[in-house]
């Protein structure tokens, strides 16, 4: 009887060791906006803003454009930076031919392509993005990740915003720069209501 119990235990252990891991949570889809998370810091809960081809935490609203002559009164306010993707690649949530890709430049700066252009500087990182769903259905935020993490540094001459960087080889950050997480929340809108960002 002892032998059978040991054999059964060994069999159960072997089967559980072979059981496939539960599937990872699906990558969220759709449009989303981002705020920063770094408790007890000047960047905690600041919105991510796209301006002039780069990304910032806080400061002025995003730079955007809506062709009133084409869209008329349907132009949205353009005061929120909206993203889409996060399954290796990332883009701005805009309606413009070719879209606007988000990448980490060779200097580490989180950047985006200008409208109607696919140019990305040589040495940029384009495919290390991932998006994580909220841990439970009651949580409002998931995460946007860059494989090696994010850093925010005070903008030159501006105490109200911080430029966002990805931690890449060769990029140097001073002690005034802060590592942080990006909290991703679903954006209630459709692509047709989003403006293109100006460079």
Where in the sequence are the language-model features?
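Fungal secretory targeting signals
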Residues: 1-21
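Intrinsic-disorder/low-complexity peptide segments enriched for small residues
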Residues: 4-9, 81-82, 88, 192
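General secretory precursor processing signal
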Residues: 6, 69, 78, 155-156, ...
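Residue-level signal for mature regions of secreted extracellular proteins and peptides
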Residues: 10, 59, 67-69, 145, ...
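Compositionally biased, intrinsically disordered low-complexity segments
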Residues: 15-18, 37, 85-87, 93, ...
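Extracellular glycan/ECM-engagement signal in secreted proteins
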Residues: 19-56, 105-199
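Short, well-structured hydrophobic secondary-structure segments
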Residues: 51, 57-108
